[in-house]
Amino acid sequence: MIAHYSLILKPIHSPKNPELKQLRLLFEKARERKKKGLFVIEGEREIKKALLGKYNFTQLFIEEGSTPETPEVQALLNQTTAFQVEKNAFQRISRRSGSEKILAVAETKSHELEHLKLSDQALILVVEAPEKPGNIGA
């Protein structure tokens, strides 16, 4: 279980904890996410995808009694500020029901055109005002 991680996890017992209040703001307010340059990732699979995308993580929130299953996510416990959140408090901040017992806060990336890194033979598709944007890539 999470026993050997408890030394590096800061305990949170109340849903009124300032860290959880900030997390809730990031979940609910796009303006807050943009202002802080942060976003919330829920679930271990999504966190692993963000790791592959080389996102920088600032915080990790794990439900009390849970532990990350993958070594990559376990390694984040040593690289970020990590919290062990009491079950009731965690359920109040979590947006998904079920087995997702981990949340992360990561820094947003700039997706401006001037920051785009292209290979020498890149294929670029420009689409302006598509009628059904959901069909792009289908």
Regions found by a protein language model. Name each.
Residues 5-65:
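Boundary-proximal intrinsically disordered activation/regulatory segments immediately upstream
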